[in-house]
């Protein structure tokens, strides 16, 4: 197995070109993505998405309406950027990586960032200057993550992927993988904070 690390916004285009066989990157099977790829059964659902803000101004952001006229960052080509685009009056700022987004927030280049809930919690836990805005409660539930394959599954991978997901789910291995990944992410967040 070979793992390729690339920016999120290029994943489905590279998959379509055949640069790799699957995309395993916390990707949600949205209607738009289903036009260009096929998806496995869900393997994990994160906590709901969240908006990170600076702690000293958190009381200004009780509802999504409070982001009118504010710059809100999100990762390029993600459903979180779609959510930012839906916040009336907010100015979306799209960047390639979550770390870049956090740095923009820390250095006052954006007013807020919208990321996966688990990611937001890790950064808030590691950095007392960042908190999850109360307005996050209005964002709704998280969508489940799935594995993407080329449209039409020309390599016949989905049946095996779905069988592996079912087996790992039954054996609680996915939860173990998530816990291990969260522990590693906590270390990475502490180093970057």
Predicted features, each with a name:
Residues 50-60, 143-163:
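A bilobed periplasmic-binding-protein/Venus flytrap-type ligand-binding module shared by bacterial periplasmic
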Residues 1-26:
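Extracytoplasmic small-molecule ligand-binding "clamshell" domains
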Residues 79-92, 131-136, 162-193:
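Ligand-binding clefts/hinges and TM-proximal coupling segments of bilobed small-molecule sensing domains
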Residues 25-36, 83-85, 111-141:
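A ligand-binding cleft/hinge motif common to bilobed small-molecule-binding domains
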Residues 35-45, 49, 132-137, 145-148:
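A structural signal for short loop-to-beta-strand junctions that line the ligand-binding cleft
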Residues 15-16, 67, 105-106, 147, ...:
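Hydrophobic residues within well-ordered alpha-helices
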Residues 16-25, 70-71, 106-115, 119:
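Alpha-to-beta junction loops
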Residues 28, 46-102, 117-121:
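Bilobed "Venus flytrap"/periplasmic-binding protein-like clamshell domains
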């Amino acid at each position: 197995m070979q793992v390729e690390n690339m920016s999120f916004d290029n994943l489905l285009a590279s998959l379509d070109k055949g640069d790799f066989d699957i995309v395993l990157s916390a990707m949600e099977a949205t209607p738009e993505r289903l036009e260009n790829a096929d998806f496995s059964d869900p393997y994990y659902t994160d906590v709901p998405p969240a908006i990170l803000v600076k702690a000293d101004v958190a009381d200004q952001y009780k509802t999504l309406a409070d982001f009118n006229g504010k710059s809100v960052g999100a990762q390029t080509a993600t459903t979180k950027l779609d959510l930012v685009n839906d916040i009336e009056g907010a100015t979306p700022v799209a960047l390639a990586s979550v770390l870049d987004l956090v740095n923009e927030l820390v250095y006052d280049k954006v007013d807020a960032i919208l990321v996966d809930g688990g990611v937001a919690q890790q950064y808030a836990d590691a950095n007392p200057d960042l908190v999850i805005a109360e307005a996050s409660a209005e964002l709704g539930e998280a969508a489940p993550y799935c594995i993407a394959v080329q449209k039409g599954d020309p390599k016949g991978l989905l049946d095996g992927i779905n069988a592996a997901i079912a087996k790992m789910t039954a054996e609680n291995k996915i939860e173990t993988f998530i816990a291990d990944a969260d522990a590693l992410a906590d270390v990475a967040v502490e180093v970057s904070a």
